[in-house]
Amino acid sequence: MDRRSFIFASGAFAASVAGGVPAPPPRLKVGIVSDTHIQDEASARHFEKALRYFRDCGVDAVMHVGDISDWGLVSAWRYAAEAWGRVFPGDKMPDGRKVVKLFTTGNHDFEGIKYWDQKEEMLANGYSEAELLVDNGIERQWERFFGEKFEPVIRKRVNGYDFITTHWNHRGDIAEWMSAHGGELDRTKPFFFFQHVNPDNTITAGCSGDRGVARRAFDGTPNAVVIGGHTHLSLTDGHQIWQGGFTAVGAASMSWSELPFGYENARQLNAPKDHVDEMPPLPCRFFQTVKQGMVMSVYDDRIVFEKRDFTNDCELDTPWVVPLPAAKSRPYAFDAHSASMAVPSFPDGAEVAARTVVGANRKGEMSVQMVLDFPSAVRGVVRAYDYEVRVVPECGDGEIVCRVASPTYNCGFAHECKEVRAVFSVRKLPHGVPYRLAVYPRNCFGRAGAPIRSQTRRSS
């Protein structure tokens, strides 16, 4: 669903044709975040900022889909609990209405210092292994800070809707639980399962860990909505919602964003295998910039996921509107979603400037590089997720040189960049034949708009 369709649909939902009578409010409203990766009091402020936004939205509950802590320390959970207490003292709204915690754990809560150089980072910041959650009774710490027992499977009901979760160390238990208790769930309305990892072969992009458990538990249950985190993939990517035998939704990250595989400006972990580190990486873990979350509103006939850019305090992207009952319509099955999504286009008169320079790659090594500069492909709220650069020899054969993500692929509409730069080694260019460079703007499903082309060039 593109933004124009969403606005029309929202207007139809919001008021009846006769007399403009406002539609009833949602039955349920839930704030959703994941992967806060709290290290210290400063990083906990981002979580608190999201909580304040959720409070102002009047949510009934707040869902945290795991990786509350980054290094897996007791202090991180304490900072999170203190932030919650400042915003929702006594688990209540200012008007006294109860706000339900829907929290679970992720891999970093159990083993955060095992990744990359996080142990060194933790020690350098004045924290100690002596406060690792796993060495201080993680179950007891959960009850201490979040006020509930640490159980393998947790079920709560909010405004008549069921929410079920499993902790990181029990992420394989849901299939057995559904076999035993699934019949107790009301199949006339949606229910929600959330875990840190995403269901395999749904919204995952090479990073999951679910091992097919959620598919076994929920396939053939169209009223199930499964929400996961872990991948840090942006909510501007349409692959972060999927519909098949159930509905799966990614919760993105409140710490940093990651790119899918295949981009020259991704960090090395996600870049193409044949890339040579010519382009600087877009901000990722080590820069921890854009923080994303959602507000989910449940109505009788739809679920609306409003996406938020908490860094820039603005709407992130077009909301997802899931019709109910989900069995009758699956607009977010990948094929249907791709077909309905508009393709981006460059502004009229856009040009690409191409030049060769002697520069340096990420390792600081001298490199002869092709540099392309061109305007962002933005028209209204339709914008490019990435750009594909192709070499087009005069003989007619085409070769994909590289794909680069938009520098603001994970930011709100209001903060879309004006210009894009692509950099790659001249070793990717044909030698001794005339060629042109073509730049295609693409949406998140890889569907491309009309290209802009450079003047004819020749490599010696």
What is each stretch, according to the model?
Residues 74-180, 185-187, 213, 217-222, ...:
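Extended active-site neighborhood of metal-dependent phosphoesterases/phosphodiesterases
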Residues 274-403, 451-452, 457-458:
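A short C-terminal boundary segment appended to hydrolase-like catalytic domains
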Residues 21-78:
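N-terminal active-site segment of His-dependent metallophosphoesterases
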Residues 429-446:
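Beta-strand-rich modules
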Residues 386-430:
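Recognizes extended acidic, P/S/T-rich segments that occur
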Residues 4-22:
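N-terminal export signals
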